[in-house]
């Protein structure tokens, strides 16, 4: 049996080889996983910034220092804490500079690094994600500011989506997802809403964590590139993307099958019409007094 070609053309194979070489020069030891149409890297994002397509849209939830002491995701609240340590970067100031050269940029948690955003230089806007959605304030962040510099930034507004500890709206509701996949996992519905505000074909998340942005991008029909320096997050993101693509594949195959069976139904109907016409033609006309 002939071997399946990994690359459609020689040029594609050469390009992939050049990309691998560039990757190893920029970040020796970086891992790369291609799960078409997604590329995932395990490496420090800042080193890989030059590899990213310049026309892509950055949609990311970066790590940043939360408060003076930092937010402790390992602190138990009602239930025992799920995480034994905070994720990388939660104790450092975030510098958005490497990502601001992209034509479309959506940054979550912007209230933690206001002073580094170029608020005078390009069209930008703000959205407030209201996480309490009308519930009583508790020991959880009431909301989060999102900074957007997109082709046509929307007017400032509010996204309401319940997200306080175990109380989560949408597909991450505790009945569907009892344990979160990442200490700072974001809701799929919110990420999809943000991606819809961008126009680029490729969505870039340099701090992908468990890969929520990538899955959201796939659901919005975009390709995506994600980076995380933590190998565990990288593994979770890879398996999420793979599972999503399988689902989408099954869904597409289901849609195609439904389309085929509709076409079959239609041709069957057309066949029946032809048959009925033929029967009409071949049946000798009954005398008028014997017509039913
Ligand atoms: C706030 S979390 C993202 C969570 C994600 N939105 C989700 O839904 O799962 C930030 C992620 O950035 C990663 N990170 C921190 N510093 C990084 C760096 N320099 N390069 C790449 N990833 C980094 C952390 O490991 C963490 O997984």
Can you say where each PLM-predicted feature lies in the sequence?
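Conserved phosphate-coordination/catalytic loops
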Residues: 8, 85-93, 181-185
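Membrane-topology and secretion signals of cell-surface/extracellular proteins
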Residues: 40-42, 191
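BZIP DNA-binding basic region
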Residues: 1-25
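A short glycine-rich, Lys/Arg-flanked "PGG" loop and its adjoining helix->strand segment in the class I
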Residues: 91-103
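Conserved SAM/SAH-binding loop
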Residues: 43-47
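Class I S-adenosyl-L-methionine
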Residues: 26, 51-60, 64, 68-75, ...
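Mobile active-site "lid"/loop adjacent to the S-adenosyl-L-methionine
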Residues: 66-92
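Beta-strand-turn-beta hairpins that frame and shape the catalytic cleft
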Residues: 32-40
């Amino acid at each position: 049996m002939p071997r399946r070609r990994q690359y459609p053309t020689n040029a594609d194979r050469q390009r992939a080889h050049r990309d691998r070489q560039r990757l190893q020069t920029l970040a020796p030891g970086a891992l790369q996983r291609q799960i078409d149409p997604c590329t995932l890297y395990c490496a420090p994002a800042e080193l890989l910034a030059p590899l990213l397509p310049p026309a892509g849209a950055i949609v990311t939830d970066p790590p940043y220092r939360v408060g003076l002491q930092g937010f402790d995701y390992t602190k138990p609240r009602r239930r025992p804490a799920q995480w034994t340590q905070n994720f990388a970067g939660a104790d450092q100031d975030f510098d958005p500079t490497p990502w601001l050269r992209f034509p479309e940029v959506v940054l979550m948690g912007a209230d933690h690094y206001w002073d580094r955003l170029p608020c005078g230089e390009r069209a930008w806007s703000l959205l407030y994600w209201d996480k309490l959605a009308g519930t009583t304030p508790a020991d959880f962040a009431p909301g989060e500011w999102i900074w957007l510099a997109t082709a046509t930034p929307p007017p400032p507004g509010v996204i309401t989506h319940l997200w306080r500890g175990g109380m989560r709206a949408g597909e991450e509701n505790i009945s569907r997802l009892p344990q979160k996949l990442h200490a700072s996992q974001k809701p799929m519905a919110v990420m999809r809403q943000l991606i819809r505000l961008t126009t680029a074909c490729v969505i870039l998340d340099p701090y992908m964590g468990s890969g929520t942005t990538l899955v959201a991008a796939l659901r919005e029909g975009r390709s995506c590139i994600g980076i995380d320096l933590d190998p565990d997050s990288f593994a979770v993101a890879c398996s999420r993307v793979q599972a999503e693509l399988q689902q989408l594949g099954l869904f597409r195959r289901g849609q195609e099958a439904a389309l085929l069976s509709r076409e079959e139904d239609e041709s069957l109907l057309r066949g029946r019409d032809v048959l009925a016409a033929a029967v009409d033609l071949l049946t000798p006309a009954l005398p008028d007094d014997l017509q039913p």
